[in-house]
Each structure stands twice: as structure tokens, then as C-alpha cells.
Swiss-Prot record:
Top EC category: hydrolase
Entries under Gene3D superfamilies matching the protein: 3.10.50.10, Glycosidases
Organism in which the protein naturally occurs: Rattus norvegicus (Rat)
Gene: Ctbs
Summary of the function given for this chain in its UniProt record: Involved in the degradation of asparagine-linked glycoproteins. Hydrolyze of N-acetyl-beta-D-glucosamine (1-4)N-acetylglucosamine chitobiose core from the reducing end of the bond, it requires prior cleavage by glycosylasparaginase.
Domain GH18: 24-367
The name this protein goes by in its record: Di-N-acetylchitobiase
Glycosylation sites: 178, 213, 247, 284
CDD domains, A to Z: GH18_chitobiase
GO biological process terms, semicolon-separated: chitin catabolic process; oligosaccharide catabolic process
UniProt keyword terms in alphabetical order: Glycoprotein, Glycosidase, Hydrolase, Lysosome, Signal
InterPro entries, A to Z: Chitinase_II/V-like_cat (IPR011583), Chitinase_insertion_sf (IPR029070), DIAC_cat (IPR047898), GH18_Domain-Containing (IPR051887), Glyco_hydro18_cat (IPR001223), Glyco_hydro_18_chit_AS (IPR001579), Glycoside_hydrolase_SF (IPR017853)
Length: 367
């Protein structure tokens, strides 16, 4: 059986089931909470949620969209709708498949049906795969975004279709995308202004996850392409990177192992990601305490592990995030968001509660 025939058969079997699910009683306390959110707020606060129940402690006074990257939770959907916030699907697909228009149509129809069945408000397309500029995938990706937007907007009133892009449009991680075409084709781009050391072309040393000037250079590149600032939402990291130092100089320069990535000799793969809640528990007992790098406008600290090895941890905190939030406001970007909201400590501990409130508060742009 050909791939297109198999897809059509799967769709024929799946759609009636999803339609029946959608028609079932609303899981919310009020039927109105199962209706899609139709209004659009002036300032977007876009939240990625990866599961569990920490969402109950989020700052819902700010949130406009929750992208569900964990298991679907109808309770989350009901609560978000009660606060006027959208809840959107994750959209991921192998790029080699989307060259086929029949496959694209089937994939989109399934996603629309799933969103309807789960009373959701759209989709966040997260495809972080390599694309060659001269490949058929280059045009197919833009077509997928355009057709997905058309399908969702037609079938779900007020729905939102967004696309995740790297911190810069300049071929990061070998992703040659039609950025202007994709921006035109969807509601807005979520710019992942983090993992900016995924390809290290200079010295193999530890550095900030999202250095201030480098981050802003990426937005300048997008804006110079003619993409409207109203089509850009700044993504900031609520996690950092922990690197083992092969050598730590007196100036706190941490030499790291050479781990190549997509052509670059070194990368942040030499380290590992650490959520902010873990960082806050470790920083005060570290060798150095929290330090501030003026060039990168980011905090870091050094610590020794039980075997005596020195580590350097780079992260973002309310100070570094506030600087970026001010840029969002000054240049009229669509909004701000983070990967991911689960990274904070939502326990009843008084200090943790204060730290968590400060991180949410840093999202509010100040000049």
C-alpha cells in the first residue's frame, strides 16, 4: 500500500472517532469553557508546559498562550480558558514526509480534528530539523505552515498557528528556512533565544545560554529581513547549562570538551541543561557564588563536584531577563515567552516562592 493511501485510510478511521470525542460532554465545569478563545491580546506571554500539575501555580495574570508539550490535561485546558488563555497543540513532523501534498493535508486534518476533540485553540509548529536551501523541503515547510494556518483558521474560529525559529535566521544548526514566507504564513514566530552556543566556532569555552548582544543581533537580522516586530515573540530560557571545566583560568574562563555539532567544532552539548529551580539551590553553596559577566550580561557561578572537578554554570535570572524584556517593549515585539514554565520551584518554601515570583515578574517589560 502506498504511503498516501495508508494516510488516507488512517484519516478515514481516525476522524469519526475524533469528531465523536469532540461532541461528547465538555470536561469543564461550564460548557462555555470548552469554546475556543477568540480575542487576541495586545501583548503575548507564550508559555511552554511539559506536564504534571505545576501549571496551577503559574502567573495566570500574564499568560496568553500555553503550548502543551507534555501529556494533554483537560483540567489545564478548562483553567486556561477560564483565564482567557489559549491552549495549543505541539506540531512536529518529519520533513521528508511533508514534500508530499497528500501527506500534508492528512497531517493537518488530523491535527485540526485533535484540537477540536480536546477543545484546543491552535498549534505551535516545532520543527528544528536541518534543511538545505536548495532542497524540496525548503518550499514544503513554508507550504505546511501556510496550509496549517488556513486549515486551523477555517475550522476553529480565533485559532492561532505559530512556528518556532532559532535565535537567528542565519543558518543556525543548518536550518535554512524561508523565514519571511513562514512569518507571513502564520500568526507569529516564537524566537528561541536560547541554546545560542549550539555551534561554537571560536574558542571552546563555556558561555551564556543567551548572551544579551548576541540575542539582540538575532532580532536585528529578523527585522532587517522585513519581518514585522509584531510577528516576533521573544523566547527566553528558564534553564541554564552546567559545563565541566577542563581548565578554569584566574579570569573565570572555563575551557570545555570539544563536542562537534552540525559542522561546528564545539557546542553546548559539552554541558547539560539545568532548570532554574536546581540552580537556585546550588548557587549559594558554590565556590564562587553568583557572578555577573558584563560582556554577556548574564550570571554564572563555579562549583566543585564530589570528585573535585570544577564546573561552570551559566543561566538567566530576573536581571538578565529584564534587560531582554525591555528590548521587547522598546522595539514593539509581539511579546515574550519561555522554555519552559516547569523549570521554576512552585513549592511552598518561602524563598523559592519569592524567586519564582521574581522570574515571572521579569517578563513584564520595563524601559
Amino acid at each position: 500500500m502506498a504511503l498516501s493511501d495508508l494516510l488516507e485510510l488512517t484519516l478515514l478511521l481516525l476522524l469519526p472517532l475524533l469528531e465523536r470525542l469532540s461532541a461528547e460532554d465538555c470536561p469543564c465545569s461550564e460548557a462555555s469553557l470548552c469554546r475556543p478563545i477568540r480575542h487576541h491580546r495586545d501583548f503575548e506571554v507564550f508559555v511552554f508546559d511539559v506536564g504534571q500539575k505545576t501549571w496551577k501555580s503559574y502567573d495566570w495574570s500574564q499568560i496568553t498562550t500555553v503550548a502543551v508539550f507534555g501529556k494533554y490535561d483537560s483540567e489545564l485546558m478548562c483553567y486556561a480558558h477560564s483565564k482567557g488563555a489559549r491552549v495549543v497543540l505541539k506540531g512536529d513532523v518529519a520533513l521528508k514526509d511533508i514534500i508530499n501534498p497528500t501527506f500534508r493535508a492528512s497531517w493537518i486534518a488530523q491535527k485540526v480534528a485533535l484540537a477540536k476533540a480536546q477543545h484546543m485553540d491552535g498549534i505551535n509548529i516545532d520543527i528544528e530539523q536541518e534543511v538545505d536551501c536548495s532542497s524540496p523541503e525548503y518550499e514544503a515547510l513554508t507550504a505546511l505552515v501556510r496550509e496549517t494556518t488556513e486549515g486551523f483558521h477555517r475550522e476553529i474560529e480565533g485559532s492561532q498557528v505559530t512556528f518556532d525559529v532559532a535565535w537567528s535566521p542565519k543558518g543556525i544548526d543548518k536550518r535554512c528556512y524561508n523565514y519571511t514566507g513562514i512569518a507571513d504564513a502564520c500568526d507569529f514566530l516564537f524566537v528561541m533565544s536560547y541554546d545560542e552556543q549550539s555551534q561554537i566556532w571560536s574558542e571552546c569555552i563555556a558561555a551564556a545560554n543567551a548572551p544579551y548582544n548576541q540575542t539582540l543581533t538575532g532580532y536585528g537580522d529578523y527585522l532587517r529581513m522585513g519581518i514585522s516586530p509584531r510577528k516576533l515573540v521573544m523566547g527566553i530560557p528558564w534553564y541554564g547549562y552546567d559545563y565541566i571545566c577542563l581548565n578554569l583560568s584566574k579570569d573565570d574562563v572555563c575551557a570545555i570538551a570539544k563536542v562537534p555539532f552540525r559542522g561546528a567544532p564545539c557546542s553546548d552539548a559539552a554541558g547539560h541543561q539545568v532548570p532554574y529551580r536546581v540552580i537556585m539551590k546550588q548557587v549559594n553553596s558554590s565556590v564562587s557564588g553568583s557572578q555577573w559577566n558584563q560582556d554577556q550580561q548574564a550570571p554564572y557561578y563555579n562549583y566543585k563536584d564530589p570528585t573535585g572537578r570544577l564546573h561552570q554554570v551559566w543561566y538567566d535570572n530576573p536581571r538578565s531577563i529584564s534587560l531582554k524584556a525591555a528590548f521587547v517593549k522598546h522595539y514593539g515585539l509581539r511579546g515574550i515567552g519561555m522554555w519552559n514554565a516547569n523549570c521554576l520551584d512552585y513549592s511552598d518554601d518561602a524563598l523559592a516562592r519569592e524567586q519564582t515570583e521574581e522570574m515571572w515578574g521579569a517578563l513584564r517589560p520595563r524601559l
